[in-house]
Amino acid sequence: MNKTALITGASGGIGKSISETLAARGYNLLLHYNTNQNAAAELAEKLSQMFGVNAEILQADLSAQDGADKLTSSIVQPIDAIVLNSGRSHFGLITDVDNATVQEMVQLHVASPYMLTRNLLPGMIRNKSGAIVAVSSIWGETGASCEVLYSMAKGAQHSFVKGLAKELAPSGIRVNAVAPGAVDTNMMNQFTPAEKEEIADEIPIGRLARPQEIADATAFLLSEKASYITGQILSVNGGWHC
């Protein structure tokens, strides 16, 4: 029987790659999106046709207080894996960030993943199995000037992962995170081509990460090959700030 995975932010660059990778491994998929319905629907249709899996799309704004409850209320089937991938960066001085932006970023990266996971855990605990992976960021480990809000949110994700892993280990559920460095997705569009080159030059491997490389790390942590790994932050950053 195929396992079922929920992937938040499935229509974005990393989310799409994770979805494709898990579909290739036989997972049925619940693909969450916020605004990009067309991209999510096209992805679901493509994966169903290519891999013969069930792929359903679900809409929710996880930056809203009721977003997580709205999303999980529409899920009726047992969940075997959760990929907490929704997120967005924010660039700017701390003194220029208003309260509404702070609340939205904390809701999106911290509160909604907490609530979503809490709502789905009873079934996983009954089954005494499951795996959860949060897609966080290198800045959750090191922090970044002019991305203090984003760094704070991602650091909170890491604490969530470590605490939850200890709480759920007796129930046979593993919890980990993948912490990417600079990844070649639309999130990097805030930088000019020249700035992207400068960032790549700082990375020992000499280039930005590909979304597929983040997807492969995520799939590994969900797999039985990682059966004794929990509470860990797997840095996928090409040696940048390691």
Curated annotation (Swiss-Prot):
Which residues carry out catalysis?
A: Y150
Residues involved in substrate binding: S137
InterPro entries per the UniProt record, alphabetical: NAD(P)-bd_dom_sf, SDR, SDR_fam
Q: Which UniProt keywords apply?
A: Oxidoreductase
Q: Provide the disulphide bond pattern.
A: none
- Determine the domain of life of the protein's source: Bacteria
Q: EC number(s)?
A: 1.-.-.-
The molecular function GO annotations come to: oxidoreductase activity, acting on the CH-OH group of donors, NAD or NADP as acceptor
Q: Which Pfam families does this UniProt record tie to the protein?
A: adh_short_C2 (PF13561)
Positions with a binding annotation for NADP(+) = T8, G9, A10, S11, G12, G13, I14, G15
* GO terms classed as biological process: fatty acid elongation
Gene3D superfamilies the UniProt entry points to: NAD(P)-binding Rossmann-like Domain (3.40.50.720)
Does Transcription count among this protein's keywords? Answer: no
Keyword Oxidoreductase present in the record's keywords: the answer is: yes
Annotated family = Belongs to the short-chain dehydrogenases/reductases (SDR) family.
Q: What is this protein called?
A: Uncharacterized oxidoreductase YmfI
- Which source organism? Bacillus subtilis (strain 168)
